[in-house]
UniProtKB/Swiss-Prot annotation:
Signal peptide: none annotated. A motif ('HIGH' region) lies at residues 123-133. It holds the Pfam family DALR_1. Its EC number is 6.1.1.19. GO terms for biological process: arginyl-tRNA aminoacylation. This is Arginine--tRNA ligase. It is found in: Cytoplasm. Monomer. The gene is argS.
Length: 613
């Protein structure tokens, strides 16, 4: 069961081939002029250039073949050789009934599914998520859902930031503030010989009582700022980090407490966003792989000493860029920069952990493709890591891809901040969206018949839909301006508008059930029925483009057009008050099919629609 665009492309390809030309010229697209045609093929122009022939002559040959296609009511040539096609109402009726009967609403599964890992969100221990995590979380979640829906075997990994210097900062700050914990940690440099599970539980209980998430939230920013001004404290934190990574027993227990309480809070926020992960693997999970990996890189001849540090050169011969030196002179240097694997102090670096993570993923999951949903400002870093991984044989060339995204900006065009100039916490952003959704629902007179609990649940869904759709309607690589008033409107291209149309269709279906009207065979006749069927048929094309470009905006665009087109259909074609049973049954089936496809699209965007408003 192919969508019309694909099946007509196949027919046009055969027609070009029959004319002695490449079938590649037979690409059919939706018409730029829906008033003239449903589909168009511009291949005659490209074919004419290639074959040095008249384009209209070629178009005539192709049209002569296509005219025999029973699905086409008309095939005409426009201008110098554009081919316009109008689909027959019978063919549209057949296609509408196919989509209605299909649980996937016209979406085809992949012929050759792959194993795919999506690395997204990147939350950190002891750091509350902020608005910068919004895009990584919701774009990554949508890409994961899309790939899984298409048929790939997909794993979503949060790639938890649970290692590194921030841990040493926190340990040092807590030891300074809490004498009891300091004394406890000083006793637990190594695991005591007789240290039972009960003893360990007792220590963890002490940590739970004395160190809360609020404490981490308070201590980390202060410690981070202090280490910039206080070299002694910075050195203490570095030492604590090294001892933690070398296995100091008490530090490991306290670190585990940091991870536990941070993850509980993070899972709560991700749940509110409708985001979930198959894996919560952290940077700490690959630490044991780093030393043998470094030795392996050395054996492969990839590690190079550079002023006491150890690097992997990833630039190819001749790849250079101009660099301005402090004295003002300009020199040519290799580009991309080498990947720093081991610092001059002997520490493994951020890129080293990423490289070890690729190695770990290959061993545990062996994915055909790993997608990294991370801010596009990290593009250079990923280019270095990916090239190093390919050189080392840790991944097949082309199997690692950075799907970068732009920033969410304030009205000044700069990354969004609070009025005080700070970074807005994600929790606070979600609550702002909920509050604005409550206000919008009351303004529109919606939700008045709901219980308080149901109203709150609906407001949450509306708020999250507003945030997600505002983001996902843009191509991920572009930045956009945050405007909560516009995002939460029930009019225009917004998430709440899509939810309203979904709820509206559900209301129609409930009334139909009350009146005992049952859906039946779809018979396409009216222009609004044609338009709706053609858009339902376009679902597969939208999914295919979103999949190929790792870009959910194509799904968002389709969902919006579908909601708009249904609204026009409903205004032009009465459903329950239609003048005969067959028409009522047909239009009701179109409404059911629209709802099925709309909610499928919303689910792929990570948006949940309420039953009522």
């Amino acid at each position: 069961m192919s969508d019309l665009k694909r099946s007509l492309s196949e027919a046009a390809a055969a027609a070009f081939q029959a004319a002695g030309l490449s079938p590649d010229f037979g690409r059919v697209t939706a018409s730029d002029r829906p008033d003239l045609a449903d589909f168009q093929c511009n291949g005659a122009l490209a074919a004419a250039k290639s074959a040095k022939r008249n384009p209209r002559e070629i178009a005539v040959q192709v049209v002569d073949v296509l005219k025999a296609d029973p699905r086409l009511a008309s095939v005409e040539i426009a201008g110098v050789g554009f081919i316009n096609m109008r689909v027959s109402t019978d063919a549209l009726s057949i296609r509408a009934n196919e989509i209605a009967a299909d649980p996937r609403a016209g979406a085809e599964p992949l012929a050759h599914p792959r194993r795919v890992l999506v690395d997204y969100a990147g939350p950190n221990v002891a750091k509350p998520m902020h608005v910068g995590h919004l895009r990584a979380s919701i774009i990554g979640e949508s890409v994961k859902r899309l790939y899984r829906f298409r048929g790939d075997d997909v794993v979503g990994d949060a790639h938890f930031g649970d290692w590194g210097f921030q841990m040493g900062l926190l340990i040092s700050a807590i030891m300074e503030e809490d004498a009891f914990i300091r004394a406890l940690l000083e006793r637990l440099v190594e695991a005591p010989r007789e240290f039972s599970k009960a003893d360990e539980d007792k220590v963890m209980s002490e940590f739970a009582q004395r160190v809360t998430l609020d404490d981490l939230d308070r201590l980390y920013p202060a410690a981070s700022a202090r280490q910039k001004e206080d070299p002694e404290f910075k050195e203490k934190a570095r030492k604590a980090t090294a001892e933690l990574q070398n296995g100091r027993f008490g530090y490991r227990l306290l670190w585990r407490h940091f991870v536990n309480i941070s993850r509980v809070a993070l899972e709560r926020e991700f749940h509110a966003l409708g985001v979930d992960f198959d894996l919560w693997k952290g940077e700490s999970d690959v630490q044991d792989l780093i030393a043998p990996m470094v030795r392996q890189l050395e054996v492969k001849g990839l590690l190079v000493d550079d002023q006491g540090a150890r690097i992997v050169r990833v630039a190819r011969p001749g790849e250079t860029k101009k660099k301005k030196l402090p004295d003002g002179s300009v020199v040519e240097v290799e580009s991309p920069d080498p990947l720093l694997v081991v610092s001059s102090e002997g520490s493994a670096m951020y890129g080293t952990t990423d490289l070890a993570t690729i190695l770990d993923r290959r061993k545990s999951f062996d994915p055909h493709l790993i997608l990294y949903c991370v801010d596009q400002r990290q593009a250079d870093h990923f280019e270095q890591v990916f090239r190093a991984a390919y050189l080392a044989g840790y991944a097949e060339p082309g199997s690692l891809e950075h799907i970068g995204f732009g920033t969410m900006n304030g009205s000044d065009g700069k990354p969004f901040k609070t009025r005080a100039g700070g970074v807005l916490k994600l929790h606070d952003l979600i609550e702002m969206a909920r509050e604005k959704a409550r206000e919008r629902l009351r303004e529109a007179g919606l939700g008045a018949e709901l219980s308080q609990e149901a109203f709150e649940e609906t407001a949450h869904k509306v708020g999250i839909a507003a945030l997600k759709f505002a983001d996902l309607q843009n191509f991920r690589g572009t930045s956009y301006v945050f405007d909560l008033d516009r995002f939460t409107s029930f009019e225009g291209k917004t998430g709440p508008y899509l939810l309203y149309q979904s709820v509206r269709i559900k209301s129609i279906l409930r009334k139909a059930a009350e009146q005992k009207v049952v859906s039946g065979a779809i018979i396409v006749g009216e222009p609004a029925e044609r338009d709706l069927t053609l858009l339902l048929d376009a679902f597969e094309g939208a999914l295919s483009e979103a999949y190929d470009k790792k870009a959910p905006n194509f799904i968002a665009e389709h969902a919006y057009k579908l909601a708009q087109t249904f609204s026009k259909f409903y205004a032009a074609c009465p459903i329950l008050s239609a003048d005969n049973d067959a028409t009522r049954a047909s239009r009701l089936a179109l409404a059911e099919t629209t709802l099925k496809q709309l909610e499928l699209a919303l689910d792929l965007l990570g948006i949940e629609a309420p039953e009522r408003m």
